[in-house]
Amino acid sequence: LKLASQIEKINTMHELYPKRLIEVDLPIKRISEHAQNEKNLRSGHPWHLHIWWARRPWGACRAVALASFLPAPTDERCPESFIVKASAILSVFGLSPNGATREQLQDSLLKFVGEYACWELGANATFRDAARQLVQAAYPEHTPTAFDPFAGYGAIPGEAARLGCDSIASDLNPVALLCLQTLLVAVPKNGQELLDRFREGADFVRFEAEKRLGAYYPKHKGKHPIAWLWARTVTCEGPGCGAEIPLIAQEVIDRAETKAWIKISGDKKTKDVQIHVKQGMAIPAGLIKTAGGGHAVCPIPECGFTTHKTRVKVQGMAGKMGNRLYGVVLAVGQRQGKEYSDTNDEDIAAYTRAAVAWERVRKNNSSADITEKYPYHDPRAFTAGNYGIRTWGDLFSPRQKLALWTLGEILRDYHAQLLKDGASESLARDTITALALSVSNTVPFQNNMAWYSRGMNYCYKGMGMSMKWDYGEANPLVSDYAGGIHFAFHQAEEAIRATLAINNSSTSVMRANAAELPLPDDSADMFFSDPPYYDVVPYADLSDLCYVWLKRFIGHLHPDLLNEMLTPKAEQILVNPYSMADGRGEQSPERYRERMTQAFREGRRVLKPDGIGCIVFAHKGTGAWETLLASIIDAGFIVTASWPIDTERAARMRANKSA
């Protein structure tokens, strides 16, 4: 009865209030162009503080939010006061001449919305002030409130705040919440002081890291390594062979002007397999791979046996899969190129020293062992589980664990230094959190699922994490390369600068289940969200890679967020056919629809009768769309418009197959 009453109230209000601009038109071509350009940005954007998945372009969210707040001038119920004010505001841009008709004003508003989707214009004071004035003209009696119960990385609440609104962001994931609190609360609250402390802290961490870890990351023939090249190994099961096969799936590692490749050879008598890294102007013919389709091919010519993928899995599950260090990538000058080389005795000795040092750390610190469970029950998105990976700790070598653990110790030392120097508890916590997120942003490169091809690539593939036969180990101390703390701190500093340009501190961040929001009835003017994508993005599992380190870095500063073994799974709204085997409860399509309906119904409860809901959904499957629309309608919303916006850059993974 309550839902029926709400729906009746919605229908009545829908007839009384003017349509919003987004309900009659939207400059989708211009918004899409800006969105694709924004996706190509490599620095100077809030999302470079830390990795997150399925992120929406902030400029597109800004444009959609603005078009949702503003009434459509061509609607006869649009207030005359808005017509007058909007015309005056847009006259600054030459978009609305005196005496313009309502149709002309609407066209001018659409042009403004389309241009304001440009990421760079978000920091332009003239555009920002005009957008805020337009929102104020649409809401002359109060500051509108927008809320996003699936806030993720914060594009929607961040851009609502940029428009001058009271913005509310909530999520369940602690990694997302740390990003939200840092970008949308700590940065605007502390301003330049946080940026200054962050820069000082980055210098402190870099200096201490070099001092404490430098011996484990030595130069190679006088040059700084960017990365080391590794291959997993299995035993050839060919008759009478038994050679140790290094699994090389990528025989060419750099196709740039100075090319690099791998030459593999084997000796019949000794059963020894040699790997050499070569470099030159032309890639020779006849290079071989030893891994393909999950199978292992023996490179000894007299053998050539293919160990079937099922047997490779058996060896992995039995703990018989090894790792072999075979190459090193060197920095030449200031980004003047790269040099590729075989490893030498010192490379191997340094790694061995790190392994011994890590063993000492592990014995002296009960929390050093990373025993948290890897999602091995999901062979679809996390294929390493098929090869014996059982904990998140299995994804890190001893040297990588030592480096990350040491960086955490340095962060704790800097926290103590901040307090000693007179910083407030709040500022010290916010600064260390931003630094910890920066270090955490190297974790996707600092594991044995990351791979090297012209440069370090992180471990995630699509929306999962696939097994890597040959992988790269990034040098965390080297300057200006992905996987290192220098690059991570630079990216984070630029992200903080970009967030400062939002120039609004009225964002509230809370941890909440989208189906049970701690917000009063009829309290928000806009419900704008990007809900979970049915069966595509396992956010919680993906974020656990960083979570296990963040809780070791700053768990003492955020005991409310970082007090569980792993990120919460049972309450996430997702379709996962393997959830029952993993003990996290049913996550079927039927359950997804039920819980999504609950979330939308809760959104409807919080939304004012004259409020507007806006849902972003980027799934390519019709079944997922049908389920989402059914949930929206079941929750009592009236669907008045739908717009296709292309937010993906053409070069992204799977772009040619996505809707």
Question: Predicted segment positions?
Answer:
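Short, Lys/Arg-enriched N-terminal segments with co-localized hydrophobic residues
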Residues: 1-12
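Nucleic-acid modification enzymes, centered on SAM-dependent nucleic-acid methyltransferases
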Residues: 13-147, 157, 161-520, 539-585, ...
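Class I SAM-dependent methyltransferase "Motif I" SAM/SAH-binding loop
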Residues: 150-154
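A short glycine-rich, Lys/Arg-flanked "PGG" loop and its adjoining helix->strand segment in the class I
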Residues: 593-609, 634
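Short glycine-centered segments of the SAM/dcSAM-binding site in methyltransferase folds
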Residues: 612
